[in-house]
Amino acid sequence: MKKEITNNETVKNLEFKGLLDESQKLAKVNDLWYFVKSKENRWILGSGH
């Protein structure tokens, strides 16, 4: 069970790192970007124009 939790945490960390990498690319665009976590525990990227 402990290994499963560790694997899940690793996947979440990799997903979050990917989101941060993407946000750095998007930050170069003059716009407002945000992240929201859904009820299904998924990250949603949005833009406010």
Swiss-Prot record:
Induction: Repressed by AbrB. Induced in stationary phase in LB (rich) medium; the transcript is present in log phase cells grown in modified competence (MC) and MM media. Coiled coil: none annotated. InterPro entries: YydF-like. It comes from the Bacteria. Suggested to be the precursor for an exported, modified peptide that has antimicrobial and/or signaling properties. Synthesis requires YydG and YydH; the peptide is proposed to be exported by the YydIJ transporter. In the absence of the transporter, the modified peptide activates the LiaRS two-component regulatory system, possibly by eliciting cell envelope stress. This activation can occur in trans in cocultured cells lacking either the transporter or the whole operon. NCBIfam families: expor_sig_YdyF. This is Putative exported peptide YydF.
